[in-house]
A protein has these predicted regions:
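Bacterial N-terminal signal peptides
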Residues: 8-18
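Generic hydrophobic, helix-prone segments enriched in Leu/Val/Ile
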Residues: 37-53, 57-60, 64, 70-71, ...
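Sec/Tat signal peptide C-region and signal peptidase I cleavage site
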Residues: 20-25
């Protein structure tokens, strides 16, 4: 009798629970499948170990992300390192993104935003991307894609992240933007643009800009 009551309770719970959508059938990828080149890019980004390196509140070597000053250092360049991480990742992929020594680490993301949109960025092979759907698609195809928010206040830092391959749905893309990897106040191997840029009012969705560079 007790077993019957337990079974009845379990059955009622199952019947009353919401039916979860089948991801592949009802929510197909927004931006195409991840190509072999996209899979290689994703593996490369995973191996950057961003959640252990380029950490905030310490001075770091921009190329390696490792601390290069003592624990008590309180001078300039010890805050966040989104732009150093983006430049280091691009360099390892054989792509130039404005970096030291051409520009110091302080306010580098703002300078990268100005540089990449200008003639020097175009000469280096960077091209603007029309929208976030195209940005995610290009990343899935294995292209290097960055998303930038130069701060309207030139004395305050902006933000930059790298779009990583993802098979997120169109609904998730519209709500949260592309999937990115970033350093910042908190480093994330995988996070959406909406949350990754939330400390910058006016950034997502209309304030950010996307740029791409082909990879060999």
């Amino acid at each position: 009798m007790q077993i019957n009551r337990l079974l009845a309770t379990l059955l009622a719970a199952i019947l009353l629970s919401p039916i979860q959508p089948i991801a592949t059938a009802q929510h197909p990828p927004c931006c195409g499948p991840i190509s072999p080149a996209g899979a290689r890019l994703a593996s490369f980004l995973d191996n950057m170990d961003v959640e252990s390196l380029w950490l905030a509140n310490q001075h770091i070597n921009w190329e390696t992300g490792k601390p290069d000053r003592g624990a008590g250092y309180e001078g300039p360049g010890n805050h966040t390192h989104c732009s150093a991480f983006a430049a280091a990742a691009a360099m390892r992929l054989g792509v130039y993104l404005l970096r030291p020594p051409q520009h110091g680490q302080e306010l580098l993301s703002n300078a990268q935003g100005e540089w990449i949109a200008g003639p020097e960025g175009q000469k280096a092979g960077w091209r603007p991307v029309s929208d976030m759907h195209r940005a995610q698609h290009l990343a899935n195809e294995g292209h290097l894609v960055v998303v930038l928010f130069p701060n309207p206040d030139p004395h305050s830092p902006g933000h930059v992240a790298i779009v990583r391959p993802s098979e997120k749905s169109a609904h998730a893309l519209e709500a949260d933007g592309p999937e990115v990897i970033q350093a910042g106040q908190h480093n994330h191997n995988k996070i959406c643009v909406r949350i990754g840029f939330e400390n910058h009012p006016g950034a997502f969705p209309s304030g950010v800009r996307y740029y791409t560079h082909p990879l060999q």
